[in-house]
Amino acid sequence: PIAWRGPLKTKAILDLITLTNWGLLDYLVVDLPPGTGDEALTITRYLKPKLRGIVLVLTPGKMVAHVVTKAKNFAYIVGAKVLGAVINMSYIKCPCCNALLRPFGSLGHIDVEILEELPLDGDLAKAVDEGNLADFMINNINGNEWVRKIFSLTKKLVREVEGKEL
């Protein structure tokens, strides 16, 4: 890991955005660390003219309501629409009875639409660790719950920002 202060982070992000040949994109999804620091400020400031919305990715826990409030305030300040929230690592499905087990507890009430709840998935984690996420998703498009939910989420977001089906 590299510990960079604000100006170095900002320059690295701007270099990545401006010096990369992205080709023709319909969408650019940017995965940011939690919080409203330099990374989020730089991305939203630079991409503001084309920013279609923000999706909050949360994990269940007691501090979630506080995190959502901060993120909504940040979105308001930068003039971005919060499209909704995705709850990551929300549950494990029991292989014996299909009951949903929530190892991190329930989410509780948040003032943002929940777009999707994603399960903990050991096969997915293994694919990520081995650098095989794309192959995993392609090979499991119909069989894996996490993959199905990601594709469903993608369709929901396209409908929201474009008003059309994929």
What are these regions (language model features)?
Residues 44-47, 70-74:
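Short, solvent-exposed amphipathic alpha-helical segments in soluble enzyme
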